[in-house]
Amino acid sequence: MAIKYIKKGMAVEESAANQEKTRNIVEGILKDVETRGDDAVRELSEKFDKWSPESFRLSDKQIEEIVSSVSEKTLEDIKWAQAQVRRFAQIQKSALRDVEIETIPGVILGHKNVPVNSVGCYVPGGRYPMVASAHMSVLTAKVAGVKKVIACTPPDPKTGVPPAETVAAMHFGGADEIYILGGVQAMAAMAYGSVGMQQVDMIVGPGNQYVAEAKRQLFGRVGIDL
């Protein structure tokens, strides 16, 4: 009886070619945004997400309207989940103690845990709202003491509008600025400082192969998560 394969892994040669293609595409996008700034970000957002609003950043009024469109039950669930994440993050932070000791007269050794000034949190789009990514990036950064947290997420691929549940999770998590912007262009905007964003010190959050490659290439200019 012949073996029927439901799914096969990619051949080594094909995988290498795919990685090279991804690397080149991402490199081109990053260079374009670094060179042309806002214009490049807007063109890329229009190309990949068909999204070109007057401002990529949501105003306080827009956030309020979006959050109000989410069901009360979903909002309660988001707040409940964030309460658990926040509590554990606070316990983790309390375990990171500063240390200082004078080993011999005049010689003081130690270490301090100092939060970075700004973080860019990316929450990917998809078939369903990725609210957990907002809990685990935006919220934990605020617990850590990060002064400015910028959050980015692409528009809903089904409706073409900001994903309400994700925006709500970002907002309740403590995001200082929320942008509806996705993909490599979002990574570049956060790293270089574009469409109203200030350049961040670190970028965190999951994403597809292009987002992951963008973070890899941007490492050094900004810090990234593991």
Regions found by a protein language model. Give the residues of each.
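Conserved NAD(P)+-binding/catalytic subdomain of aldehyde/semialdehyde dehydrogenases
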Residues: 174-226
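Active-site-proximal helix-loop elements at catalytic-domain edges
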Residues: 1-9, 164-178
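N-terminal Rossmann-like NAD(P)+-binding subdomain of aldehyde/semialdehyde dehydrogenases
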Residues: 1-117
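Conserved small-residue-rich beta-alpha loop and adjacent elements
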Residues: 102-168
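Short coil/turn connectors at secondary-structure junctions
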Residues: 95-98, 114-118, 144-149, 164-166, ...
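Short, solvent-exposed amphipathic alpha-helical segments in soluble enzyme
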Residues: 136-138, 167-169, 195, 218-221
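Conserved active-site and cofactor/substrate-binding residues in soluble primary-metabolism enzymes
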Residues: 17, 21-28, 36-39, 73-76, ...
